[in-house]
């Protein structure tokens, strides 16, 4: 640790690795999407041939489910690296106080986010705030959810005090208002626990009422709103242009690119060999996570003619690349929802029914399992809905 933490560049490299771990395939780069999507009313699993996927879609998850394991282990990998940084950052003597505070504030924000994801998915779990030097040290008893949430709030409050103001931060890195925005999100979660008590979230563990937690959520969100630290992008479609990174609407965004190999999540949403990306001999676009028919119907019933649909869904039909080496797919056209086998325009088309796709995350230069598409963890639009 002495060598790594001997210079500001070394400390920054450790912080960068924290971002790398949380955005890798075990986290926002892939498996977290799968774990949290298939069982919801808005998303659906198209292919039910995989046992572990069906378990997630039906919320009947076996103890050895690999996706749950990946997410759990990946979050603790981030946490362990943050813990190491927080323990050893003091070894760096050549760092300004402002730089020290900025790095520690970002690290605490990432640790809070990691535990926030874990506690909402798994309930009570081990709280580890020091780097584990051995397997034995990493095996700790579970901590109750009220204490976990208290520690999450503590990290976010410290991040609020340590992170720089907007304008004093480097582009693409969170400033202090991100911590305040996440505090609002945490208090929303606590209000929901109080309003909907039940295992694994024992509402009796929390001393405030749902109304009080809603008020705390509102107060923190209102502070962010009044700060004018964020704003909505004028054109909704611009959010999904892969070159538009870290817009004024982005509160926290994971930087992903094909060099680091941290962005396999895109192919979880797109169809294989789709002409929108130049794949030729690989079907890395699996399209495993799809909007449900009900979600598509509700959107179109509520907002008929909504221009946002074009940049949100890939629907009706799509065509495969003409350069695909496999001639069975080359140039082939597929009809997808809202077309069904009863109303396909071309009656020679396969009678299989296909769900629509999400088309928000598209890198047209994508040729393999990774891409240059960032993932926005938290948008200002999300905060405005608090």
PLM regions with names:
Residues 7-8, 12-26, 47-122, 136-150, ...:
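Conserved, well-structured interaction surfaces
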Residues 307-386:
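C-terminal substrate/ligand-recognition segments
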Residues 1-52, 86, 125, 149, ...:
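An aromatic- and glycine-enriched ligand-binding surface/loop that stacks and positions planar moieties
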Residues 129-132, 139-142, 194-215, 374-386:
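Acidic, serine/threonine/proline-rich low-complexity intrinsically disordered regions
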Residues 122-128:
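Short, flexible active-site-proximal loops enriched in glycine and acidic residues
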Residues 131-134, 256-258, 313, 382:
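Short, flexible loop/turn elements at secondary-structure junctions
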């Amino acid at each position: 640790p002495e060598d790594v933490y001997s210079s500001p560049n070394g400390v920054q490299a450790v912080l960068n690795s924290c971002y790398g771990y949380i955005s890798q395939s075990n986290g926002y780069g892939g498996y977290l999407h799968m774990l949290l999507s298939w069982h919801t009313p808005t998303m659906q699993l198209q292919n039910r041939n995989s046992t572990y996927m069906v378990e997630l879609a039906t919320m009947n998850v076996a103890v050895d489910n690999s996706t749950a394991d990946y997410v759990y282990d990946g979050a603790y990998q981030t946490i362990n690296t943050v813990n190491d940084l927080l323990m050893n950052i003091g070894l760096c003597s050549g760092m300004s106080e402002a730089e020290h505070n900025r790095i520690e504030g970002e690290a605490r924000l990432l640790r809070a986010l990691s535990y926030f994801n874990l506690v909402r998915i798994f309930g009570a779990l081990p709280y580890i705030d020091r780097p584990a030097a051995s397997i034995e040290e990493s095996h700790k008893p579970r901590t109750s959810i009220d204490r976990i949430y208290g520690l999450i709030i503590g990290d976010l409050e410290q991040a609020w005090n340590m992170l720089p103001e907007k304008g004093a931060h480097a582009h693409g890195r969170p400033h202090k208002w991100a911590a305040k925005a996440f505090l609002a999100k945490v208090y929303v979660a606590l209000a929901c626990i109080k309003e909907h008590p039940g295992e694994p979230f024992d509402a009796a563990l929390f001393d405030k009422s749902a109304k009080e937690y809603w008020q705390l959520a509102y107060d923190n969100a209102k502070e962010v709103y009044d700060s004018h630290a964020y704003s909505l992008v004028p054109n909704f479609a611009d959010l999904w242009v892969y070159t538009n990174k870290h817009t004024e609407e982005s509160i926290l965004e994971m930087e992903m690119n094909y060099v680091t190999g941290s962005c396999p999540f895109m192919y979880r949403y797109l169809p294989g060999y789709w002409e929108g990306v130049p794949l030729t001999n690989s079907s890395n676009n699996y399209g495993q996570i799809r909007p449900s028919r009900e979600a598509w119907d509700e959107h179109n019933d509520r907002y008929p003619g909504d221009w946002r649909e074009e940049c949100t869904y890939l629907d009706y039909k799509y065509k495969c690349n003409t350069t695909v080496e496999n001639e069975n797919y080359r140039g082939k056209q597929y009809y997808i929802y809202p077309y069904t086998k009863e109303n396909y325009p071309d009656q020679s088309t396969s009678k299989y029914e296909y769900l629509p796709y999400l088309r928000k995350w598209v890198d047209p230069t994508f040729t393999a399992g990774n891409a240059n598409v960032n993932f926005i963890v938290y948008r200002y639009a999300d905060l405005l809905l608090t």
